[in-house]
Structures are given as structure tokens and as C-alpha cells.
Amino acid sequence: AQANGHYIFINSGRTYGFMPEAIKEFPFDGYVCGCGTEVIFLGKTLYHYDLDEDLKHSLQSILEECKIQAVYEGRKSCYFQKTEKPFAPITAIRNSYAKTNLEQPIRFFDDPVLDFDKFVILTDENSSLDLFHERTKEHFDFIAREEMHPYGFEEVVPKGCSKAGGIDYIVEHLGESLASCYVFGDSTNDLSMLTHVKNSIAMGNSYPEVLANTSYVTTPIERDGIRNALKHFGLI
């Protein structure tokens, strides 16, 4: 596709530092990271959303009041609560991120410097999710994700940031239009961009909500889904 003059971007909920190394080995032209909180093109950061410092430090007390566990996601570190009983998915995330090549991938909420762009929350039957939304909705948008049974799972993103917004930034930077964009997705956090672009492609193994909100469904990822869709649209 690149040989035919097309730019290829990764549009991910992850911040750049925690993008899988296997992804970074490919010569992508750019990245939309952290649900639109950072836009990178040809190795340079074109846009980055900086969260207010007081806001970042105010979140811990709200999370504790609402009995919600979270992971703050930064470009160089992720921050974890110090708790005797972390939810199982939190432990799994920490163990996975600890293996990255970053200098200090794991930090904690009591760190004097909180450098993060977005965060994820996990809830159980004791959590007060509605109260959390009420306390934070002025500053954040919420993306309901597939449950990590028995835990609820949401991404919390600075208000106005999204995967769709990241696409808009790139389109404007390149002087292109949304009509020239082709978007691939398989998860509920892809819906903002899949419903934003006309040429939206769901992988065949996508969640039902995704399959119902795209213009084209390709084969599953393990059955050359991306290649087949690129051929279908004449991009290769």
C-alpha cells in the first residue's frame, strides 16, 4: 500500500511507549496513540494533549471513594495503586507492562510526578461507577469496553480526545479528506473512528457491536483480513 502512495497509521488506545515492539518493527508512517491524546507522523509528535496537573493529582481520592481500581497510562510509565487486593486484570496489565523496554515502566500513584495521558478503570460489585462518572465527566469521556468478567472495564480519555479526533488531525495536516481514509477495527474502542469514516472495515472476528457499525467486513485477522480488505478497496 505504501508503494502505491498510501500512508499507513496505527490508531491505538495504548500510549506510544507501551505499543508492542512487534508493531514498532514495521515501517508505519505514523501513530495515533492513547485514544487520540498523541499524534505522531514520520517520527515527530505533531500533537499531544497535556492533562492539568491538579486534575491528575485529584483523581486518586475519587477512585478510592468510588472503590474503583485504575491504571494511569503515560508515554514512559504506567502508574498503579498500592493496594493489598488488586483486581486480577490490573495485576496482568502490570506484569505485561513491566516487560517493556522502557527505563521505568512501572510507577505508582504516590509518585510526585504523574506524567500520563489517559487511564483505564476496573470495577466490581462494590464500585460506584455512576458516582465516578458524575465526579469526572466535566474533564473526561468514557469508553465502555468488553467486560473482563467479573470486572467492568472502561477507558477514560480527556474530553474531546478520541481515535476519530486523531484521524481528523492527520487529515488536516496532510491536506486530505476523510473520504480518502480507510479504517480497520475490531473492538468497541474503535467505534469512534469506525463511525467517523465512510470506508470503515471490521475484522471478521470483531465484536458484534463493531460488525454492526462498519461499511465492510473482511475476513478474520488470522485469515489475511487486512490484506483481503486492501485488495477489495484497490489499495494494493
Go through the PLM ranges and name each one.
Residues 5-9, 174-181, 198-199:
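Short beta-strand/loop segments at the ligand-binding rim of alpha/beta enzyme cores
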Residues 196, 200, 204-236:
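Asp-based, Mg2+/Mn2+-dependent phosphohydrolase catalytic module
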Residues 62, 68-69, 73-184, 188, ...:
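Conserved acidic, metal-coordinating active-site core of Asp-based
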Residues 1, 12, 119, 167, ...:
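Residue-level signal for inorganic ion chemistry
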Residues 26-27, 35, 139-140, 196-197, ...:
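Short, structured coil segments at secondary-structure junctions
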Residues 2-89:
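Active-site phosphate-binding/coordination module
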Residues 9, 32, 182-184, 201, ...:
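Hydrophobic/aromatic beta-strand patches that form the interior of the parallel beta-sheet core
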Residues 17-21, 131, 166, 192-193, ...:
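Phosphate- and divalent-cation-binding pockets in alpha/beta enzyme and binding domains
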